[in-house]
Amino acid sequence: MARGKTDGSRKTRHAQRSGHGPAVVLFLAGALLFCWPWLSGAVTIPWDAKAHFYPQLAFLARALHEGQSPFWTPNVFGGHPQIADPQSLIFSPPHVLLALFDRAPSFVAFDALVFAMLVMGGLALMALFRDRGWRAEGALVAALAFAFGCSAAWRVQHVGQVVSLSWFAVALWLLMRAIDWRDRPRAWVWGAAAGLVAGLMLLGRDQVAWLGAIALAILGAGRALEACAAGGAWRGTLRALVKPLGAGSLVGALVIALPFAFTLALAAQSNRAAITFEGAAGGSLHPAALLTFVSANFFGTDGPLKDYWGPPSSMVWGETGLALARNMANVYLGALPLVALLCLGALRGGLLAREMRAFTCAALFMLLYALGRYTPFFALAFHLPGADLFRRPADATFLLGALFAVMAGYCVHRLFADDQRASGRRMAMEAGVVALAFLACVVTAFDKGRLQQAAPMLAASCAWLAVSLAFLWLAPRWRGRALAPLAGIGLLLAFDLRANNGPNESTALPPELYEALRPDARDPVIDALRERLAQSQGPDRRDRVELAAIDFHWPNASLVHGFDHWLGYNPLRLKWYADATGAIDHVAVADQRRFSPLFARYNSPMADLMGLRWIVTGPPAGDLDSRLAPGDLRLVARTPAAHIYENPRAFPRVLLVGRARKADFDSMIATGRWPQVDLRETVLLEDAPETMRARAPGSARIAAYRNTQVDVNVEAPEGGWLVLNDVWHPWWRAEVDGKPARLLRANVVFRAVELPAGAKSVTFRFAPFAGLAAQILGRAP
């Protein structure tokens, strides 16, 4: 009798484990179907993917292949500490590998890497299903919905968050394996692997990574409690978990320690050391956005922007106070997963099954968090450590989609494993629930006067829902037909996601739009800048450029081409630089070109000091600077996209001056008042002596200029001050004739070093590790 039961259970486990190989093949085929427009080069991932993340990769690759350090870049914001910036990709292993093997990564290679990470995450979930003995049909649903549903598809341009999400899936699989295999001799290896991958996830240092850590904690605790309850021996189970979980915690902590220290140090120096509750609440997900679970293009998300009527469109919804792009409000996971969650999960109890309770709790957490100010929960969650570092609770939809994908897959597993054939009464109830969800869309469209506009999308969604519901009713009848259910799921869900979450204005645009970002670009503006920068180069010069109000993707083009841009595109900027110059996170349109009291116009000491020689603007410069006077700038070229101006007053990058004067930099930033001195002969310092005779004139020339080291040859018969018009940062060090010298903050935001008589050489070197240690110990300047 016992042997018969054992044989039966083995057959059940074998049946549940069978089909995973074909499921993987179907998943990869579905992935190819979905990704082909990008992989073929017909379209490319636009917006932040190209405007921000691709230039970061291009800079990383260029630096590595030139034998330079990528830890600092002079190409944006007057200089920026890449090693501490979460979005620099320096601590993203797949991007580092691509940069090592390809000096100039193509758009296709960059996009392929993004999708490869999502495919990796999908495969990890399939491995999780196989480990747990869940059926391949459910694994296929989970993998497809995870990789190409919800925010993974609609926000694929947010590359860092997509990478964090992908690592989350792998970490989840390894964590569950470490807990399940706790009694095996090498369980600690799996725990260490889980910690390593969780650490890689957290290296993203974005909100998805932070929420992913919370989700892993909830799911890990749930699985551990489940194991304790199943075994009955709580103490023994908990003792067995110490090694794998301890190993994971140790490895994870080692992985993240140094990068986290750098980023926290940069945050303290930045324009956004913390986010206020009000600032974060503006990134809440509007409750109406949940209707896109039912109908992907319900609000016209993938059409022209003028036709979009979903939140936070003020013309339709009134003033919401939200700051979200339209694609951030789309959470479509596929009709089949939605029907599975509603019918098999909610009505048939799948979501409350023992294996799913932790997933349900984690999903509820993410849903409430994403809704932000629309529920009281976010006010409580905002007190969690780290919550005030992020500004958009709607980012939780990344994790919500991943959790829903697993939950939907589990519900499909139960459908086949338990042969859950629906009675007529149950079918009527399930059809009613799906109809109610669909009716909510219809009523909303009618209420907002958009029913006619939404009708085509609603009709398509109705068809996908009906087919998916019918499939789940009929599929259990095909249990004995080998691969028929798998093939049906693969075809239905893959084509659904391709049709509804496929290329659109938010996720796919022609690559020709981004020609200026190619390392070998043949763009008129890039060509003109290359020519003029070469012509104006001198022994003491390294002229800066401004790329303002040309287009969304232009501000970080300097990272690709090696231009020194005093602006850029990055939400994280050095506070003293942003305050002094007015630089904000972007300069894609005219009203983002902000002037500050200290940099009040193009004809200003700040513009001249930074060596701003070439100014490129989309509209005429006078549209950006209302105080521009004739002769302030000289128009030197016009292209179809831009005007190119020369500032003839731009200073060289290095100057040797003979006089110093004390100045209150905070007061200067606030009032915009410059002392009445000749800045070619005098340097402003915060702690200069009250009286100082002028030194005899000298000279300076740049001997070598690299990302993290600048060598300058000087002739200083009576000494003086060498001014380097690069942004000051406490992690830079200076040497004069090979001996350490004090690096001074000069002229509000730049660098200087005092020279003794007869000095011959000065070296400025970026020393982030020593600088970080000094900052932690309270010894930073």
Where in this protein do the model-derived segments appear?
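Transmembrane helix irregularities
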Residues: 148, 152, 199-208, 253-255, ...
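Active-site-proximal, structured, solvent-exposed surfaces of multi-pass membrane proteins
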Residues: 53, 556, 567, 636, ...
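Membrane-interface coil-to-helix junctions
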Residues: 30-125, 144-169, 279-335, 370-380, ...
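Extracytoplasmic/lumenal acceptor-recognition loop(s) of multi-pass membrane glycoenzymes
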Residues: 486-610, 639, 644-692, 729, ...
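Hydrophobic alpha-helical membrane-insertion signals
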Residues: 3, 10-84, 108, 261-271, ...
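Contiguous transmembrane helix-bundle modules in multi-pass membrane proteins
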Residues: 158-166, 174-197, 208-209, 213-241, ...
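Short aromatic/hydrophobic helix-turn
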Residues: 141-153, 193-201, 395
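Transmembrane-helix signature of polytopic, membrane-embedded enzymes
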Residues: 125-148, 185-188, 425-426
